[in-house]
Design a protein with these regions (language model features):
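Acidic catalytic cores of enzymes that act on phosphate-bearing nucleotides/polynucleotides
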Residues: 115, 255-268
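Bateman (tandem CBS) regulatory domains
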Residues: 133-136, 254-258
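Glycine-rich phosphate-binding loops that contact phosphosugars or nucleotide phosphates
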Residues: 86-232
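N-terminal segments that mediate ammonia production and transfer
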Residues: 1-86, 99, 108, 112-113, ...
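Generic hydrophobic alpha-helical scaffold/packing signal
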Residues: 54, 149-152, 208, 238, ...
């Protein structure tokens, strides 16, 4: 089936042969709306790949295309993104795991392109150390990460505007945050994240561009160049994935190393 009922905290679902009943915290029947889930059986198959992670690495070009689709326009330089809070003078990003690394990249991009100060906190630490003002951007692939949900609830208690970047429509985070922004990658089964990580960075880049235009940090000409580059991004990814054999050779040389140093600067 592609039909689902989403449960809220404290609700109980009773499944019988021909009946589904949902009870609220007080034991009273709750009227729930069925929603269509955008997925196909092919999403849960390896489609000839050795494992799901390899499949999802190769799905990155289409994932980036879907994340950008309808959100960028070259005809008239514009970022068509969900309505963002007009006053985003200060941003805190909360996330866990791979999404936290996407947030680190997002901090660099937003500060560079929009001039907006960005703070980043592990979601599990936000309630203790995080800033309780401005806009909070929560990043979670599943939309169900407990620490991220807890951080958003904490932020809302202090009146923060909240944005959720997630991959799953109807997930818990989308019902809590003020604005959900979907990465639209399709199911990701492999761990650690692959296509959802790159799509999260793409969405953060769009946020940076929109803020950069609002803050007068980016000209129309600059935006045109960025949008043109974003449109070519799926083909760039295809080009890199076409060098898989070379990459496998390098991986083969590294696989038995006891330690590896990654050295970079800036966003790297």
């Amino acid at each position: 089936t592609n039909r689902a009922i989403h449960l809220n905290d404290g609700e109980i679902c009773i499944l019988k042969d021909n009946n589904v009943k949902v009870l609220d915290e007080k034991g009273k029947e709750a009227i729930k709306e069925e929603r269509a889930v955008d997925w196909s059986i092919e999403d849960a198959e390896k489609s000839g790949y050795q494992h799901f992670m390899l499949k999802e690495i190769h799905e990155q070009p289409s994932a980036i295309y879907n994340a950008l689709m309808g959100r960028i326009s070259e005809i008239e330089p514009r970022i068509n993104l969900e309505d963002l809070e007009s006053n985003m003078d200060e941003i805190t990003i909360v996330a866990c795991g791979t999404s936290f690394y996407a947030g680190m990249a997002g901090k660099y991009i937003i500060e560079k392109l929009a001039g907006t100060p960005v703070f980043i906190e592990l979601a599990s630490e936000y309630r203790y150390f995080g800033r309780k003002s401005g806009t909070v951007i929560a990043i979670t692939q599943s939309g169900e990460t407990a620490d991220v949900i807890g951080a958003v609830k904490e932020a809302k208690k202090y009146g923060c505007h909240t944005i959720a970047i997630t991959n799953v429509a109807g997930s818990s985070i989308t019902r809590i945050a003020d604005i959900p922004i979907y990465t639209r990658c399709g199911p990701e089964i492999g761990v650690a994240a692959t296509k959802t990580f790159t799509a999260q960075i793409a969405v953060l880049f769009l946020i940076a561009l929109k803020l950069g235009m609002k803050n007068l940090c980016i000209s129309n000409g600059d935006l045109q160049k960025y949008v043109s580059s974003l449109r070519r991004l799926p083909s760039y990814l295809e080009e890199v994935l076409g060098r898989e054999n070379e990459i496998m050779d390098v991986a083969g040389k590294l696989k038995d190393c006891e330690s590896v140093f990654f050295i970079g600067r800036g966003i790297n």
